[in-house]
Amino acid sequence: MPNITLPDGSVRSFDHPVTVSEVASSIGAGLAKAALAGKVDGRLVDLSYRIEADTPLAIVTEKGDEGLDVIRHSTAHLLAHAVKELFPEAQVTIGPVIENGFYYDFAYKRPFTPEDLEKIEKRMAELARREIPVSREVWPRDKAVEFFKSQGEHYKAEIIASIPQAEDVSLYRQGDFIDLCRGPHVPSTGKLKVFKLTKVAGAYWRGDSKNEMLQRIYGTAWAKKDDLENYLHMLEEAEKRDHRKLGRLLDLFHIQEEAPGMVFWHAKGWTLWQQVEQYMRRTILDNGYQEVKTPQIVDRSLWEKSGHWDMYSELMFTTQSEKRDYAVKPMNCPCHIQIFNQGLKSYRDLPLRMAEFGSCHRNEPSGALHGIMRVRNFVQDDAHIFCADEQVQTEAAAFIELLQKVYADFGFTEILIKLSTRPDKRVGTDDQWDAAEAALAAALDAQGLAYDLQPGEGAFYGPKIEFSLKDCLNRVWQCGTLQLDFNLPVRLGAEYVAEDNAKHYPVMLHRAILGSLERFIGILIEHYAGALPLWLAPVHAVVLNISEGQTDYATEVARRLKQAGFRVEADLRNEKINYKIREHSVHKLPYQIVIGEKEKAAGVVAVRARGGQDLGQMPLDTLIERWQREIEARSGSI
């Protein structure tokens, strides 16, 4: 009979099989009431799960991320239940958990309105108050297919029909509502008390634009009301900071239907782009990288050799010329190996650090595109380091140190790190993996960096480190990557002559700090709400005259500032000064310089910083020195 080992190491023995719920009750009434699910030998299960053999067990409550996931998954089913009661003709499809919430896709004859969402949310609350028991059932696949067909749920029947016939399927029942799901779920709808439907959007069935357009209802669910209110406040703030809105307001960029997923950079937006790219260019050159440039379009044969044709062909834009097939490159790495392969390489040439601001194209589904955050044409701060096995740790440590400095310069100081290790299916020897994983861990440890270990989550060709930054709204953005690769140098014949005079394959380190420059600029815009630090701002300041009598002096001030290297505009319109100040404040310029008769007579300038801060009068040389220090320090505030 089962001996249950709890997280604190204590063991509870039973003389008969027990459910997770019964184990929770044996520990205490409070835990039994708080329990949402269980974790048996590392696997999440329902409270009704029957334990018949010795096993470790943790009771899952609302206090951890796993408990929140169970709540959100169950709330997605509650949403579908409510929709089916209110709109019986709607067909259900899928409803997964996503970051901070969930969604559910429906097929319905007309778009859901905001009023519909209010009704659905109200019905969800009613179903929750009824405390309907939620139970798991296991059916033969064919029985489940026939059942959902009989209910008119053709999408759900299609999903189940794709499961191998010999496999049983897991269904969850709450009242009259039944849905396909692996689970686990809360034991009763009464556990679902804090939720909110947030929006409705379109989504293609199975993510394919050739299929029907469905309606995706998004929602969020939490354990506590305060958490929900904080999250909704964050959403409100995120809406104000939406880079798409600010991109229009600040005249940075636009995207139009004729070029989906491609960015039209306006002059101010391109100035911002140049500041980011030029900063990164100086940074990599100062750290021993050589910058290269490779072709945009490459013969299909190279992508077949590299393995990308098999893995990425659906995401690749292709073309033909003179009976040859070409692909627009979705990544730079195979092309960088072509440069490495030109001429014999020696161990003395390693490490070789090769960087490119490479323009890549990927045929992302149209439904996945999102402003400049998710596009089809993007530029990466991409680099590849070719090195010997014994150089991996040193190169990894140098990269990690560089990455931290770059993020700090852009105003991000909180970095989350994940180290992903060998999967079951992999290339390379165990000795190679042991050494590579140890080198990456040692590089992180040497700098005292905390990281989450992700066993089995590495790529088949090598372990990797992922770096995510937190913005001012505590949103997490995965940007940086350090990926070891034992595979591609072998596939593409990259070799060097080692000290033993034999040819060896180098280890290839794929690395990026910003990732997509488009996406990173979108993150910057939202992080700073468009009020970019002086060194990044497309326009540093505008010079404003109070009346026509100061036009000549204002023009001279603007000229001297431009001559000193600053990006300055002059607004000499015959408008009231308060009107001009308000207008330019909307555009979030770091500084406004006001020129009146007093300033002209004294040969000084009156300076206003962003946010209406009056810095008073000062000589122009003093202002120039102030700005130079601010730019050099790359200081900025949220």
Swiss-Prot record:
Which family does the similarity line name? Belongs to the class-II aminoacyl-tRNA synthetase family.
Q: Which InterPro entries match?
A: aa-tRNA-synt_IIb (IPR002314), aa-tRNA-synth_II (IPR006195), aa-tRNA-synth_II/BPL/LPL (IPR045864), Anticodon-bd (IPR004154), Anticodon-bd_dom_sf (IPR036621), Beta-grasp_dom_sf (IPR012675), TGS (IPR004095), TGS-like (IPR012676)
Give the signal peptide, or none.
Answer: none
Xref: Pfam families:
HGTP_anticodon, TGS, tRNA-synt_2b, tRNA_SAD
Q: How is the cofactor bound?
A: Binds 1 zinc ion per subunit.
The highest taxon in the source lineage is Bacteria
Q: Which organism is it from?
A: Aromatoleum aromaticum (strain DSM 19018 / LMG 30748 / EbN1) (Azoarcus sp. (strain EbN1))
* Subunit composition and interactions: Homodimer.
Against HAMAP family, the record matches this protein to: Thr_tRNA_synth (MF_00184)
Chain segments carrying region Catalytic:
242-533
- The main place the protein resides is cytoplasm
Essential cofactor(s): Zn(2+)
The UniProt keywords, alphabetically, are: Aminoacyl-tRNA synthetase, ATP-binding, Cytoplasm, Ligase, Metal-binding, Nucleotide-binding, Protein biosynthesis, RNA-binding, tRNA-binding, Zinc
Q: Does the keyword Zinc-finger apply?
A: no
Give every TGS domain span. Answer: 1-61
What protein name does the entry list?
A: Threonine--tRNA ligase
Q: What does this protein do?
A: Catalyzes the attachment of threonine to tRNA(Thr) in a two-step reaction: L-threonine is first activated by ATP to form Thr-AMP and then transferred to the acceptor end of tRNA(Thr). Also edits incorrectly charged L-seryl-tRNA(Thr).
This protein's record includes keyword Aminoacyl-tRNA synthetase: yes
> What GO cellular component term, any one, is given?
cytoplasm
Q: Which reaction does it catalyse?
A: tRNA(Thr) + L-threonine + ATP = L-threonyl-tRNA(Thr) + AMP + diphosphate + H(+)
Q: Which Gene3D superfamilies match?
A: 3.10.20.30, 3.30.54.20, Anticodon-binding domain, Bira Bifunctional Protein, Domain 2, Threonyl-trna Synthetase, Chain A, domain 2
Location comes to: Cytoplasm
Q: EC number(s)?
A: 6.1.1.3
GO terms (BP aspect): threonyl-tRNA aminoacylation
**Which residues are involved in binding Zn(2+)?**
C333, H384, H510
